[in-house]
A protein has these predicted regions:
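N-terminal nucleophile
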Residues: 13-274
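Intrinsically disordered, low-complexity polyampholyte segments enriched for Lys and acidic residues
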Residues: 4-7
Length: 274
């Protein structure tokens, strides 16, 4: 159980309609993300193991070779959020998919590896995004922000945290979902995996655009993904569909790999630049 209420990263950053939660414990953690998207986009494909030069990785696919959520054998996890509160520079044509960002970075073996790839990367012609990275060996959480012209970053403490966003209103999403989460942290099993699943399936305040499990006419939570990192194992669970139906259907797709030993790392840079 996590004793302290987590931090919130809502309207300060904006982003894709989603809820992202990280629950930290020493050099382990659990992490969950609701992917809220236009229904016409479809649920995508379940996680698979991907072999890179630097590391094994697990992630679901959006159907076009991209992803929004991934982890690797070193326990690093990345989550991508569209940054909708920042207006892209209209003089540029945005033709490159943000879904390609994580696959280009996820074989990084450390925070310094990932920094090196970022420094060599070119995000030109990509719409604004935020990338949240969790690094258990370093006990650090980082957030990179691309506004379509410049890349910035923010370092967070190693503590439990939520991110809320909505294309309708980041402020209202943070207010409504944040209130639900603050209440949930008083529950006896707060911080557990079962608690996290129930939280991300919540309709507290009635199903709608600002409930954690989103329901709108043309947009809803299309899938739920989770990562569990322990000293010896990396596990990703994934459910295609609204999280509110998980309890009835009980079809969470789960896949796991062994956690690599950081003491055996060679000096190397993780990925090729984007």
């Amino acid at each position: 159980m996590v004793s302290e209420a987590p931090k919130y990263s809502g309207p300060r950053g904006g982003g894709l309609m989603c809820t992202l939660t990280v629950v930290t414990r020493n050099d382990t953690y659990i992490m969950a993300m609701n992917r809220d998207e236009k229904i016409a986009r479809g649920t995508g494909f379940p996680p698979e193991i991907h072999e890179f030069e630097g590391a094994q990785a697990i992630y679901p696919s959006d159907g076009d070779g991209g992803t929004w959520f991934a982890t690797n054998e070193y326990g690093i996890a990345l989550a991508l959020l569209n940054w909708n509160t920042v207006a892209p520079h209209v003089i540029d044509i945005k033709t490159r998919s943000r879904g390609r960002v994580i696959p280009a970075l996820i074989d990084s073996r450390s925070l310094s590896d990932l920094h090196a790839v970022f420094d060599a990367s070119n995000f030109k012609e990509m719409m604004p995004f935020r990338l949240v990275g969790v690094f258990p060996s370093e006990q650090k959480i980082w957030e990179w922000r691309w506004d379509s012209k410049q890349l910035g970053f923010q370092a967070h403490e190693w503590e439990s945290r939520h991110w809320f966003s909505s294309s309708l209103s980041d402020d209202r999403a943070e207010s409504a979902r944040g209130a639900v989460c603050r209440t949930a942290w008083h529950e006896s099993d707060a911080g557990s995996l079962s608690w996290l699943r129930i939280l991300h399936a919540s309709h507290a305040g009635d199903p709608g655009p600002f409930s954690l499990c989103v329901h709108r006419d043309d947009v809803k939570t299309l899938s739920y993904s989770e990562v569990v990192v322990t000293p010896g194992l990396i596990q990703m669970g994934h459910f295609r569909g609204s999280p509110c139906t998980m309890a009835q259907i009980q079809q969470i797709h789960s896949i796991e790999i062994e956690r690599a030993d950081r003491t055996e790392l060679a000096v190397s840079v993780g990925s090729a630049a984007i």
